[in-house]
Amino acid sequence: MIDTKTAIEKITNGEFDNLFTDIYIDSSMIDYQKKRYVHAIEQYETIYCPDKVAIFSAPGRSEVCGNHTDHQHGMVLATSINLDTIAVSAKNNNDVVRFVSDGYDMITLDINDLEVNNDEAGTTVSLIRGVLRGLKDHGYKIGGFNAYATSDVLVGAGLSSSAAFEVVVGTIISGLYNDMKINSVEIAQISQYAENVFFKKPCGLMDQMACSVGGMVNIDFKDPTKPIVKKVPTEFEKYDYSLCIVDTKGDHVDLTDDYAMIPSEMKKVANFLGEDYLRDCDSNEFYIHLDEIREAVGDRPVLRAIHFFNEEHNVKNAVSSLENGKFVEFLDAIRKSGNSSFKLSLIHISEPTRH
């Protein structure tokens, strides 16, 4: 914990510059981040009062390979990015969470009321309530806190703004009440629970895991209760490459129902083959019975199942290529993944926008 005035002084005079470089990598971002953090602390002081606070960060994520495989217990390759949600926070002396996100009204939540409220589906308060409930059910201590948060993770742009928010809430509770002892995998699982059960979006676990664990990670969800997480070495600069985030001005905020159709249709194929998830299906059996499956469930579910089976190979190839320094082969796996994802995407293809 650090006094807000002291934090501002130390940030301003450069005492945390090395820490900012560790977090954001790009040295050209440091001045911006220093101003951003100072502004967040000042907003906290204005809304609440000068206090001893902790400052938490949770990054957005980019899927690298393994599109729509996580909800079928498949494999993914994902990375955190240097756009993040930060929260200035401190305990308060009651059982109330007071949470202000930049540009929004204060959310007030009684931590003794952590039941699912269907009227809150799709709202920020549902995510906070769900994370708190999940942490409590896992035996962790929870309590009231004040927080001010600001985010550079674009909403509805495929960078997992909701996952970053869930993870930062979980990390606040870990830091303020549990000595930062809640591991990143468990925070991710609890965050997914909040989004599935309270927010009512049937997402897989990739988003939360990438945001919580950080870095480039290969995640195997064959047993989603015990996902296998492996850090993957990346030296993009060695090949004069960078991962760039482009704001296309499109969004998927209103596509939850369309999104939900993807796991639903994939499961139809899995069910035909006697399983609950495609990961447990034999791809050879799938192709042997292809005509029967098409007749039973339709063409789009079949195409999405083909995508899943191919995508599992793409992930393996991408990871192996990075581990063995075969960058051209890595790019080839990414292109194959993107091509398949594009062809089997939602009906509503984003139109180019002019600004």
Positions of PLM-derived features:
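C-terminal nucleotide
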Residues: M1-R61, I86, A90, N94-A121, ...
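Glycine/serine-rich anion-binding loops at beta->alpha junctions
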Residues: A58-H73, D152-V169
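Structural signature of FAD isoalloxazine-binding scaffolds in flavoprotein oxidoreductases
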Residues: M75-N94, V213
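DPxDG-like acidic metal-binding loop motif
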Residues: S80-N82, L159-D179
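Glycine- and acidic-rich phosphate- and metal-coordinating loops
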Residues: L132-L154
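Alpha/beta catalytic cores of group-transfer enzymes, especially the acyltransferase/condensing modules
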Residues: D179-P227, V232, I334-S337, S341
